[in-house]
Structure formats: C-alpha cells, structure tokens
From Swiss-Prot:
The keyword Ribonucleoprotein applies. The modification Phosphoserine is found at S54. InterPro entries: Ribo_uL30_ferredoxin-like_sf, Ribosomal_uL30, Ribosomal_uL30_CS, Ribosomal_uL30_euk, Ribosomal_uL30_euk_arc, Ribosomal_uL30_ferredoxin-like, Ribosomal_uL30_N_euk. This is Large ribosomal subunit protein uL30-like 1. Pfam families: Ribosomal_L30, Ribosomal_L30_N. GO terms for cellular component: cytosol; nucleolus; ribonucleoprotein complex; ribosome. GO terms for molecular function: RNA binding; structural constituent of ribosome. Belongs to the universal ribosomal protein uL30 family. PROSITE patterns: RIBOSOMAL_L30 (PS00634). The gene is Rpl7l1. It comes from the Eukaryota. PANTHER family: 60S RIBOSOMAL PROTEIN L7 (PTHR11524), RIBOSOMAL PROTEIN UL30-LIKE (PTHR11524:SF13). Keywords: Phosphoprotein, Ribonucleoprotein, Ribosomal protein. Coiled coil: none annotated.
C-alpha cells in the first residue's frame, strides 16, 4: 500500500539541455522565416514571357498617343473648355500598360494610379490639355453640388502621416486646413464644389476616390462598355456615372 501511495517522480531535464532545445527551436523558426521570405522574393522575380502581339499592341498604343498629342497642337479648338464650368471630375477607366511616357506621367500627375479612381480637377487651360492628352483612358465631366457632396460624404478620405483617415472628424479638417479658412466638412465640400484660391491645397488633402465597380463587370468588356459608356468627355452626364459608381 505504501508503494502504491508513493508519487511517481517526474524525471528532470537538465538545464543545459533545455537551453539547447530552446536555442534549436529559435534557430528553426528563423530558418523557416528566411525560407518564406526567399520564396516570396523568388516568386516576385519570376520572368514574365510576353507574346509578340503584346509588343505590337503597345507600339500601336504609343503611336496613337503620339498622333493624338500632335493633333492637339495643330488644332487649338480641341483645347478649349467645352462649357463654362469651374470644376471637373475625372475617372480612370482603362489600364495604361504600354502607353506613351507622356500619357503615363499625366495619369500619375492627376493622381489616378488605380483603375476606377477619381479626382476633382479645377478647370483651367492647363488641366484641359492634360485631360485631352489622356482622354482615351479616362472619362470626365462637370459634377454638380449634389455629386460633390455625396462623393465626399461617402468616400472622402485624407492622407495624414502616410495613413488614410476617413473624413469623420471636423477637428482633423480644422487642424490641417484651418489656415485656409476650412474648419469643417461643409467648408471642405464648398471649397471643392466652388473652386477658390485654396482649391489646390484642399484637393491635395483628399485621397483619390476609389469607386465601386463589380469585378465580374470588368471581365465582360462589351457589357461593361454598354453600361458605363466609353472614355472621354461627357459633360453633365458625369453625374449619372457618379451615382452609378458611388
């Protein structure tokens, strides 16, 4: 009975063996992490084979861009502002792989880095020239106050300290735009809808608007074009597209 009552002694593991085991586990974890990083790096550096047709298509795109820009130079009326409106809204509708360097740099200057992103632009001769340069890849027109308000209220975001912040706090707006007389969301909407002398500062405070487009819709190019319309200038009809994508 005494033997049954005795507790079984658990064999103790030497301390030096425990240290070795812990060091071995840490080494294996480090090696696994390094292997994962190396795998990702190899995957990112994979060669991408392109068909001959893609080079031909890129060359055709660049030539078309070059001819279009040359036509703008010899046809001054093409650069005239279509209507007396102070504000335009631009939406990128096409991919820009293989386009000319001028078109790509203009797209980046407008801030349209992502497909179906949109920005507000103050209508000037310089901005109209930029829009005409990239017209086959964007659609643009003149938004009304209702469209401006709905876009900012629903999708308005600001980039602060490399972080995207939704426009839900007037304190943030006043902190960054107060010196321009913009202290709340209503002031911001008014400054965008009716561009004043501080339009550039206020629009730079806003992130590009990422609009809502179903993935399956973009795959069906024929149906998508029929529903969304073609790129280019569309005047007041841009408001209908904003309602559709907002």
């Amino acid at each position: 009975m005494a033997e049954e009552g005795e507790r079984k002694k658990i064999p103790l593991v030497p301390e030096n063996l425990l240290k070795k085991r812990k060091a071995y586990q840490a080494l294996k974890a480090t090696q696994a992490k390094q292997a994962l990083l190396a795998k990702r790096e190899r995957k990112g550096k994979q060669f991408r084979f392109r068909r001959l047709e893609s080079f031909v298509h890129d060359s055709w795109r660049q030539q078309r861009d070059k001819v279009r820009v040359q036509r703008l130079e010899v046809k001054p009326r093409a650069l005239e502002v279509p209507d007396k409106h102070p504000l335009a809204f631009v939406i990128r509708m096409e991919r820009i792989e293989g386009v000319s360097l001028l078109v790509k740099s203009t797209i980046m200057k407008l801030g349209l880095k992502k497909l179906f992103s949109g920005v507000f632009v103050k209508v000037t001769p310089q901005s109209v020239r930029m829009l005409r340069t990239v017209e086959p890849y964007v659609t643009w027109g003149f938004p009304n106050l209702k469209s401006v308000r709905e876009l900012i209220l629903k999708r308005g975001q600001a980039k602060i300290n490399n972080k995207t912040v939704p426009l839900t706090d007037n304190t943030v707006i006043e902190e960054h735009l107060g010196r321009f007389g913009v202290i709340c969301l209503e002031d911001l909407i008014h400054e965008i809808a009716f561009p004043g002398k501080h339009f550039q500062e206020v629009s730079s405070f806003l992130c590009p608007f990422l609009l809502s487009v179903a993935r399956h819709a973009t795959r069906n190019r024929v149906g998508f074009r029929k529903e969304m319309g073609s790129p280019g200038y569309r005047g007041d009809r841009i408001n209908q597209l904003i309602r559709q994508l907002n």
